[in-house]
Structure formats: C-alpha cells, structure tokens
C-alpha cells in the first residue's frame, strides 16, 4: 500500500531533517527532506493525473513555444539566462553556507533569509534547467507527467516564497519598531512556525490547483505558448469551460498574494514612519535606501504574479506573459540574495572571514538565537 510506503520511507526520514547545532542552539534548518518528500509524492500525483489523459489526444507530450523561438536572438537569450541561473545558484548557495558557518549570522533575520535562498535555488531549478536542456538538444517538448511535476513544484515553491516574504517584512517591522520585544516576538519557536507555515501554504496551493489544471481535456494543439507549464498558458489549451476554475484560482491568489503583500506594505509603512523620527540624517537615508530596494524587488515579484494569476486568461497576451514570468521566475531568485543579503555589512564581513579562514581558526562569539 502506498500509505505504508509514505509513512516508512517518506515521513519518517522527514523527521531527521538536517540541522546545524552549535552551543545547544538550533541555528538553521535545511529542509532538503521537504523537497525530497515532494519528489516522492509526485509519482502518485502523476499517476492520478495521468489517468485523466484518456480525455485528451493520443499524444501525451506538450510543446513549448518559449523564449528561443527566434533564431537570431536565441543564442543571446540562452547565454543571458545561463548566466542568471548560475549566478542565482552561486549567490544563494553562498548565503546558505555563510549563515551556517558564521555564528554572527545566527539571528532570526538570517535564519529566514537562509530559507529564502533555499527556496530560490529550488524555484529556479524547477524551470530553467529544462529550458536550457531543450535548447541544447534542439527540442521543445515535455511529457504530460513532467509538465504536471513542474507545475506542482512551481506552485508549491512560489507559494512558500509569497508567505515567507510577507513574514520576513513582519520580522523587520518588529526589529525596528519594537526592538525590546523582538526576542519574544521572533523567538526560535516563532521562526520555526513561520517556516513551517510557509511550506504548508505553498504545498496546499500545489496540491489543490495542479490536479484541477491538468485534468481538463486538451484540444488537438498541445503547443504551450510559454517557456514552462504555467497555469494560464496551459488553460488556453483546454477544450472545456474554465470559468469556474479561474474563479477558484482567483480566490487562491487573493489568499496567496494579496494577504502577504498587504503585510509587506503595512510593515514597511510602519518602518518608514519610525525611520522618519530618527535624529540621524545618515541613518534615515540608509534606512530609506534599504526599504526602497526591498520594496522594488518585492513589488516586482508580487506585481508580476498578480497580473498573471488574477486576470482572466482572455486578457492575457502571450508575449507579455512570458516577459512578466521572466521577472518573477528567473530574475527574482538572482536579485533576492543580492538585495537582501550580499549588500549587508554583516554578510560581507562573514564572506571575508570565510575567505580568510585558511590563515587560522578564529574564535567568534555567537548570537543568542
């Protein structure tokens, strides 16, 4: 029975999540087992969804009409996306490594940032490698089960990031506006609840929307006018009425997008109000610069996603959809570590210490988190 397989081979190993423990303090969770869990469940999702293919045509492969359909610019686009992809992996990987190994970064803020980096690495790896491989092999196809898996992972990871960004803004609000209560309001237990809630919310979105999206009967044309299996692009191939499902998707997006984004806006509004009361002009300028850069990235991420998922698909234009999707699926995972972390003096200091560690061990006093 698959239930027994799930408990013995999936749930039990999930309990043994790898943690770094220093001075009896759990510093950072590395939820690779969560990703492993998703991959183990996917065959069952694929089997369930695959049984619905009897309503479709005899061909079970989809064809992407992606970013490389113009030969004169495809080579340049391939090079740019490759650079962005490997930069995102490197920057996020460096962030996770530094937060793990440097005791000065063992704080709630960097704990949450490490999970943002991990989600970004998984997120971009769900979409970009398939694009690059298809270009190198001169093919544009993806199987039905592969499209289902990509759609599920994408929704799960992007949903988790939506929630996490909102809660990270709340963390900054507490740190700046209520510094005396910060150790209580952002305790280790609260941080674990934030991470668990983000992953749960993202997984719920994936489990709810993926089977419905892939269960529609598709017309003879299986050409997805996109570079990955995004719901609005896939729904355009459906031969059935999708109005009810679009309503369900709209409700989900209100919960997944507008609520976290409202938390972000409210948190930064309170932060800016508090910053205006600072006596230091230099401090105000630095705070405004930091908040503006954060809000730019967050607005880009949420805004593009809102346009994609909260408008009826009859209003969508394929060219615009692909450009907007590039912003929040490819660019954002690269920008997040650069904006949130690598410009920070604490992180640059940790990087210098890591590079100079070969000179000899350094004794460092850690934080209380």
UniProtKB/Swiss-Prot annotation:
Principal subcellular localisation of the protein: membrane
Membrane topology: Multi-pass membrane protein
Cell membrane is among the record's keywords: yes
Residues annotated as transmembrane: 77-97, 108-128, 149-169, 192-212, 248-268, 287-307, 322-342
Keyword Disulfide bond (UniProt): yes
Membrane side Cytoplasmic: residue ranges: 98-107, 170-191, 269-286, 343-369
Disulphide linkage map: 147-239
GO MF term list: G protein-coupled receptor activity; olfactory receptor activity
Taxonomy, superkingdom: Eukaryota
Matching CDD domains: 7tmA_OR2T-like
Extracellular side: 1-76, 129-148, 213-247, 308-321
Glycosylation sites: 56
Gene Ontology biological process terms in this record: detection of chemical stimulus involved in sensory perception of smell
Pfam family, one: 7tm_4
GO cellular component: plasma membrane
Keyword terms of this UniProt record: Cell membrane, Disulfide bond, G-protein coupled receptor, Glycoprotein, Membrane, Olfaction, Receptor, Sensory transduction, Transducer, Transmembrane, Transmembrane helix
Localization per Swiss-Prot or TrEMBL: Cell membrane
InterPro entries (UniProt xref): GPCR_Rhodpsn (IPR000276), GPCR_Rhodpsn_7TM (IPR017452), Olfact_rcpt (IPR000725)
Family per similarity comment: Belongs to the G-protein coupled receptor 1 family.
Function, in words: Odorant receptor.
Protein name, entry field: Olfactory receptor 2T1
Gene: OR2T1
């Amino acid at each position: 029975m698959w239930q027994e397989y799930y408990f013995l081979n999936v749930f039990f190993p999930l309990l043994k999540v790898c943690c770094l423990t220093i001075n009896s303090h759990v510093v950072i969770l590395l939820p690779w087992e969560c990703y492993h869990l998703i991959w183990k469940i996917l065959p069952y999702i694929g089997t369930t969804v695959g049984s619905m293919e009897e309503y479709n045509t005899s061909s079970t492969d989809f064809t992407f009409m992606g970013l490389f359909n113009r030969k004169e610019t495809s080579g340049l686009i391939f090079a740019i996306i490759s650079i962005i992809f490997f930069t995102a992996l490197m920057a996020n990987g460096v962030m996770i490594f530094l937060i793990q190994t440097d005791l000065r970064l063992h704080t709630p803020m960097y704990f949450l940032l490490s999970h943002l980096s991990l989600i970004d690495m998984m997120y971009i790896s769900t979409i970009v490698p398939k694009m690059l491989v298809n270009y190198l092999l001169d093919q544009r196809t993806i199987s039905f089960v592969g499209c289902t898996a990509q759609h599920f992972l994408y929704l799960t990871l992007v949903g988790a990031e939506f929630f996490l960004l909102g809660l990270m803004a709340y963390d900054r609000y507490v740190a700046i506006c209520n510094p005396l209560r910060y150790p209580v309001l952002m305790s280790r237990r609260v941080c674990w609840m934030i991470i668990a809630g983000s992953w749960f919310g993202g997984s719920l979105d994936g489990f709810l929307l993926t089977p419905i999206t892939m269960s529609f009967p598709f017309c003879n044309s299986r050409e997805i006018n996109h570079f990955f299996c995004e719901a609005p692009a896939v729904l355009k191939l459906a031969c059935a009425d999708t109005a009810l499902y679009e309503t369900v998707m709209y409700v989900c997006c209100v919960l997944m997008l507008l609520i976290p984004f409202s938390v972000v806006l409210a948190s930064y509004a309170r932060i800016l109000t508090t910053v205006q009361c600072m006596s230091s002009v230099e401090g105000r300028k630095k705070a405004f610069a930091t908040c503006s850069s954060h809000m730019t990235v967050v607005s880009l991420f949420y805004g593009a996603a809102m346009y994609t998922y909260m408008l009826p698909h009859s209003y969508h234009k394929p060219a615009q959809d692909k450009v907007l999707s590039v912003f929040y699926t490819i660019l954002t995972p690269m920008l997040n570590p650069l904006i949130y972390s690598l410009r920070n003096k604490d992180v640059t200091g940790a990087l210098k210490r890591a590079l100079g560690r070969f000179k000899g061990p350094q004794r460092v006093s850690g934080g209380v988190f």
